From Swiss-Prot:
Keywords: ATP-binding, Magnesium, Metal-binding, Nucleotide-binding, Nucleotidyltransferase, RNA repair, RNA-binding, Transferase, tRNA processing. GO terms for molecular function: ATP binding; CCA tRNA nucleotidyltransferase activity; magnesium ion binding; tRNA binding. Homodimer. Belongs to the tRNA nucleotidyltransferase/poly(A) polymerase family. Bacterial CCA-adding enzyme type 3 subfamily. It is an enzyme of class 2 (transferase). CTP binds at residues 26, 29, 110, 153, 156, 159, 162. It catalyses: a tRNA precursor + 2 CTP + ATP = a tRNA with a 3' CCA end + 3 diphosphate; a tRNA with a 3' CCA end + 2 CTP + ATP = a tRNA with a 3' CCACCA end + 3 diphosphate. Mg(2+) binds at residues 39, 41. This is CCA-adding enzyme.
Amino acid sequence: MERFKKASSIIETLKQQGHEAYFVGGSVRDLIIDRPIGDIDIATSALPEEVMAIFPRNVPVGLEHGTVIVLENGEPYEVTTFRTESEYEDFRRPSSVQFVRSLEEDLKRRDFTMNAIAMTEEGEMVDLFAGQEAIQQREIVTVGNAADRFQEDALRMMRGIRFVSALGFSLETKTKQAIETYGHLLEHIAIERITVEFEKLLTGTYCVKGLKELVETKLFSHLPYLQMSEERLLKATQYKWDSFETDIEAWAFFLYCIGEEHPSVFLRQWKFSNKKIKDIVAVLLAIRTRKEKDWDTVLLYKTGIYIAEMAERVYEAMIESYNPTSVKRVQSMFHALPIQGRQEMNVTGNDLLNWANKKPGPWVADMLQKIEEAIVKGNVVNEKERIREWLQGCNLL
């Protein structure tokens, strides 16, 4: 409750000004579940302009949605006006938002009952939709009619399964049936938004359970490049998923598990940046080599520590070893390398031109590459004169 106490002064101030205010959303849910608390959000009857007048230190980030960030005790808090939403457009966004003075109206528009619990600054729960009961039953239940909630915003179906992966809860029967019925509406949602939810699913503690729900609800058939992948996804659930340190590792492991032969094509369908695609593919290539042989100095140098660490963690997950010393061993090997990048070489192309008394050409790059590999292998010390002597001894000058 310590973090809530820090934010309680905002609620107290709003109440002193004649407004209602409560803690809401994921932070309240996680407090009940006893999970680490993320951002603390506050809902209030005060209109955005009233919030800004009461708290001069603010950032008006989403006034059309009633959200103002209030800076209090050195922390930013989202303060959002109670609101209700009209008919939704394209199964993803409300055509308009109306500010209201009723907490109940605000809570009833939310996705799942566990996310529709409010809490006073004293820690008293306002639970109008049996959210605590759902948490106790470890069930994910929509607020009100599941069909209505998913037709309002089809992304809620992905969010539901993402929560299965994060919390280990199960989808309540009617909620699950509604996903099976309305899964096709997911095709109205921007790929980028789906990718965010799927990535959270892959990094969840109960990822296997989430993947199984994805298959059982047939929601996978509306995801990029997975339309005909039921068997591949079931294959992925047979692996023991670890909690990876990065999303790059989670995607690499997922692609390995489903046996994806064209990872770059697959990832482009999910609208990833070129940098992220490059990193995931690099991890997969490093794993392929790692399966054939252990790390050596040249392989580690060429791979680089950033990719090598991730590849080693994924490789450990693949063989279900989870040896905590394996990544440390890779780190120690890398830090023991004579150089960790070409920029650390104590010789330049100009040095080679002077020593050889030859015109510039492709031979300079070839020679630098030979020297680089020799330094990494320990065949020559990374000192200019020693490198010159080595070149002469090898008849390369």
